[in-house]
C-alpha cells in the first residue's frame, strides 16, 4: 500500500512495519528501485511476532512453546532482503542514524532492532504510570 501511495501521489511516503509483516510482504520490493517511488520503509526487527508478547500465553505456556507458536523467531536479515531487490538499506542504531536515513531521497529500508522483552517491560511501565495518574485525578 505504501508503495502505491508513493507512486500515485509522487510524494515521499513512510511505512513503519514489523519484521514478520515485512517478511510476508517483501515481494512488494520487486522492481521498487526502478519505479521511482520515494518510500522509506522502517522495519522494527524484534526477530519475531513482538505483538504476541503482550498475550497471557507468554507466561502460561511451558518451556519454549510460546516462542515456537507465537514468537516465531526467524533470524532473517531485512537489509539483505532489501538489497537483493536493489533497494538501499541500513540499520539505524540511534535516533540520529534514523533521522539521517530518513532524510536520504529514494526508496530505502531502514532496520531498527528491538528487544521483545524490553518492549513489554516498557509498555508495562507506561501502563502503570497512566493508571496511577488516572487514579490520582479521579475523586471517588
Stretch-by-stretch model annotation:
Residues 1-140:
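Thiamine diphosphate
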